[in-house]
């Protein structure tokens, strides 16, 4: 029998406080949990709900779909949840067993269309992990979804698709719960439960799958089979992820192994006239005589609000709870990215950013081409609700060739240093742990153990061999040859008396240019790539790779 709502975590454990009254402005920042409220739907662009893709209202319309993925039942099935597993700190591996859908079916489930690249919409899945108990059982809910837009009789394009996946430890509770109902018109839902439902990962009639605590020191693994793999960037609420991205027949298998993180929420109210100016920013039509409501900033606005309201909520979290979640960054969050010159746009999977910060900067890190630094701003309360310090985590994972392009060097040669900076001062906290790896495919940076206010995580790229960033020179007229010292000058390398300058051209470029007695000789017009090396007695050798456009 399911437990009664009074015997385990309920919505009251994470309740948004009521407004004190007129003239008060509220701030509520918690992870976007709309996926625990929504159900699979297909709608017109104006929000009209359809029962199927062939519904008369949708048949000749551009449609917007939200598909919660079913579990994979065959090897050929696409757009489905393939597996859930876990590994304990002792190395014990537990493979999850599918138990059931919860609810048994959604109120607006629909059959997908492989020809239009629209996945089938089902209900969330519950798996059991017998070897990995949480605080109240061994059931875990998986909510993996794909949503996007398909034009009239057209294919749902990769650029319109958002992929989301989350795992929750759950305990099914009996109570006065009713399934959320999709609005007939619009894009929201109607919440009909009379018991508090705020902590429900999903709701069935009479029951709530209430979120519980993750077991400590346990890594979870979720594998999805997708017809449209993620493009661009993912961001998430996990720590130390390992990503497997491979072909699985005509699908792509996306497998993410990672540890859950503890994320702080802020839920507070303040009298408008007494709020600091930074807290009032973004409030619309608010005064001491109006019902101001609450602000729910996401993405770029969240870290600014965490900082601006810090004196109001006393630098203390309203609550902290475990999260295991990732999703694709939207096109909006990628607009104006400083990485655009080196990223692949919608063509490839570029990277993954994760943090347990309450608020963080939208999009991928900001790149400074002069200092070769990648900066990412994070913000959270300093302490949890009990007064304990909140410990920060951050991971940056990107393709190695992307890191090499940003620095201007070879894929296998890129290294980095990591610093946690507070108001332009680097943290000296001994507990801060950093790690940088580059296996030639993925370049990974990790930082943990830092404390919050609103620090910037700075990753400074460098060359393992000492090579300086490459230089793309303007088209040059080179009649027959150019000396090593002349190229060193062009590469902005200082050469002193007694220094030895040498040149190297890799085999891939020898049809265009060669090195003869430390002189670059041009054999064909076009592009030539050459590495200039300056050796001195008192310093390490300096390198720089140049890409030249030459005219014979």
Give the location of each predicted region.
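Proteolytic processing hotspots in large secreted/extracellular or virion-associated proteins
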Residues: 356-415
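Generic recognition of long tandem-repeat/solenoid scaffolds
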Residues: 367-391, 438-452, 495, 519-522
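Long, leucine/valine-rich, helix-dominated scaffolding and oligomerization segments
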Residues: 5-354, 364
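Hydrophobic core
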Residues: 1-2
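Proteolytic-maturation and junctional protease-sensitive modules
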Residues: 392-444, 504
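Proteolytic cleavage junctions
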Residues: 428-473
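Extracytoplasmic soluble-region selector
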Residues: 468-552
């Amino acid at each position: 029998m399911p437990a009664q709502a009074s015997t385990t975590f309920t919505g009251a454990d994470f309740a948004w406080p009521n407004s004190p009254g007129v003239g008060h402005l509220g701030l509520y920042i918690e992870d976007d949990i709309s996926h625990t409220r929504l159900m699979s739907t297909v709608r017109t662009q104006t929000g009209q709900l359809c029962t199927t893709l062939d519904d008369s209202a949708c048949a000749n319309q551009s449609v917007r779909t939200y598909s919660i993925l079913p579990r994979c039942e065959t090897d050929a099935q696409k757009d489905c949840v393939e597996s859930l597993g876990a590994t304990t700190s002792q190395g014990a591996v537990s493979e999850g067993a599918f138990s059931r859908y919860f609810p048994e079916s959604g109120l607006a489930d629909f059959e997908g269309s492989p020809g239009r690249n629209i996945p089938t919409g089902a209900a969330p899945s519950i798996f059991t992990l017998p070897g990995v108990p949480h605080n109240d059982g061994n059931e875990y809910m998986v909510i993996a979804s794909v949503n996007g837009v398909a034009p009239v009789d057209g294919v749902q394009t990769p650029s319109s698709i958002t992929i989301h996946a989350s795992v929750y430890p759950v305990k099914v509770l009996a109570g006065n719960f009713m399934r959320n109902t999709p609005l007939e018109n619009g894009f929201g839902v109607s919440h009909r439960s009379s018991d508090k439902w705020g902590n429900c990962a999903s709701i069935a009639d009479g029951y709530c799958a209430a979120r519980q605590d993750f077991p400590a020191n346990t890594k979870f693994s979720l594998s999805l089979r997708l017809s449209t793999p993620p493009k661009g960037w993912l961001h998430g609420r996990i720590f130390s992820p390992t990503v497997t991205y491979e072909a699985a027949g005509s699908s792509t298998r996306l497998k993410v192994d990672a540890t859950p993180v503890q994320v702080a929420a802020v839920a507070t109210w303040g009298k408008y006239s007494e709020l600091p100016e930074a807290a009032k920013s973004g409030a619309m039509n608010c005064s001491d005589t109006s019902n101001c409501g609450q602000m729910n900033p996401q993405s770029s606005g969240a870290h600014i609000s965490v900082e601006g309201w810090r004196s109001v909520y006393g630098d203390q979290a309203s609550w902290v709870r475990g999260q295991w979640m990732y999703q694709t960054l939207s096109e909006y969050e990628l607009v104006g990215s400083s990485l655009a010159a080196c990223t692949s746009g919608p063509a490839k999977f570029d990277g993954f950013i994760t943090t347990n910060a309450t608020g963080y900067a939208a999009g991928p890190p900001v790149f400074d081409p002069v200092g070769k630094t990648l900066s990412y701003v994070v913000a959270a309360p300093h302490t949890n609700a009990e007064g304990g310090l909140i410990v920060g985590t951050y991971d940056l994972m990107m393709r190695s060739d992307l890191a090499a392009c940003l620095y201007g060097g070879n894929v296998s040669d890129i290294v980095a240093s990591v610093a946690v900076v507070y108001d332009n001062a680097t943290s000296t906290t001994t507990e801060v742990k950093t790690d940088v790896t580059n296996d030639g495919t993925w370049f990974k940076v990790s930082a943990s153990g830092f404390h919050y206010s609103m620090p910037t995580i700075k990753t400074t790229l460098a060359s393992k061999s000492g090579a300086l960033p490459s230089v793309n020179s303007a088209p040059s007229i080179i009649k027959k040859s150019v000396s090593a010292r002349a190229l060193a000058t062009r590469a902005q390398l200082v050469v002193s008396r007694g220094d030895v300058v040498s040149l190297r051209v890799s085999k891939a470029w020898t049809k265009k240019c060669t090195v003869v007695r430390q002189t670059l000789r041009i054999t064909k017009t076009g592009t030539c790539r050459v590495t200039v090396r300056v050796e001195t007695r008192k310093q390490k050798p300096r390198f720089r790779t140049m890409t030249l456009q030459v005219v014979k």
